[in-house]
Amino acid sequence: MRILVSNDDGILAQGIRTLANTLHRAGHTVTVVCPDRERSATGHALTMHKPLRAEAVENLFEPGLAAWAINGTPSDSVKLGLDALLGERPDLVVSGINCGANLGSDVLYSGTVSAAMEGTIEGLPSIAVSLASRVRCDFQPAADFLVRFVRALEVQPLPEAFLLNVNVPALPESEILGARVCRLGMRRYRDQFVKRVDPRGVNYYWLAGEVIESEEAPDSDVVAVGEGCIAITPLKYDLTYEPGIGLLGARQWEKIFDPLAGG
């Protein structure tokens, strides 16, 4: 299988090296195209006002594995890889392994998820994979699971291209209690901007904060990971709120555009 691998933690991150090398050893043709530095929480941003540069990377991954570092975002990396760098169209796009969970509303900010979503936009099945810890970062169990997961998708391909958001609990493989297909949870944060002053007396701010503990639906990704299971959540780029179509459609919006209407 031809697989394009990207991430948002950058080319030097251990997560992408573990993922790409493990897929390569499993017999897949792997090409890495990812940011040249940390680009977490950049969402689906694209670089529009400066040129993108791609630098071939050697001696970082296993022999026979092609890799490129891009001076852009995760979405830039996948888009440039598909349109300019890869000789053949891949069968699959995989983004990760992220250091830290991407659960619930995290997916709206996540560069990891956005890199995979770019593959979906281009009509390719895509997977975003994250390790649900920023402290205990043994990526190998997540990489081994992904190899088995990709093998299962080869045997029984998805009927259409969509994104699978995979979150793996930071546990030894023997302690992971299976995998669940689930929906997005809430995952809200209590944000805090820490104000500081630089040597010139100018204020600057760091974004900090913590997760707000709240009741989650039992079929959510947040609950699955919290109970020691791998969470697999299908996602699509269509963000339409379907009930809103009916709610808004029942109103007489044409009056807004009628200059003869009262008001």
UniProtKB/Swiss-Prot annotation:
Q: What class of enzyme is it?
A: hydrolase
User: Where do the annotations place a divalent metal cation binding?
Assistant: D8, D9, S40, N98
Q: What is its EC number?
A: 3.1.3.5
Q: How is the cofactor bound?
A: Binds 1 divalent metal cation per subunit.
Gene3D superfamilies in alphabetical order: Survival protein SurE-like phosphatase/nucleotidase
- Cellular component terms per the entry's GO annotation: cytoplasm
A molecular function (GO) held by this record is: 3'-nucleotidase activity
Q: Which InterPro entries match?
A: SurE, SurE-like_Pase/nucleotidase, SurE-like_sf
**Location of this chain's protein in the cell:** Cytoplasm
What does the UniProt keyword field contain?
Cytoplasm, Hydrolase, Metal-binding, Nucleotide-binding
Kindly list the cofactors needed: a divalent metal cation
Q: Show the catalytic activity.
A: a ribonucleoside 5'-phosphate + H2O = a ribonucleoside + phosphate
Its annotated function is as follows: Nucleotidase that shows phosphatase activity on nucleoside 5'-monophosphates.
Give the protein family. Answer: Belongs to the SurE nucleotidase family.
Name of the protein in its database record? 5'-nucleotidase SurE
Q: Upper lineage ranks?
A: Bacteria, Bacillati, Cyanobacteriota, Cyanophyceae, Gloeobacterales
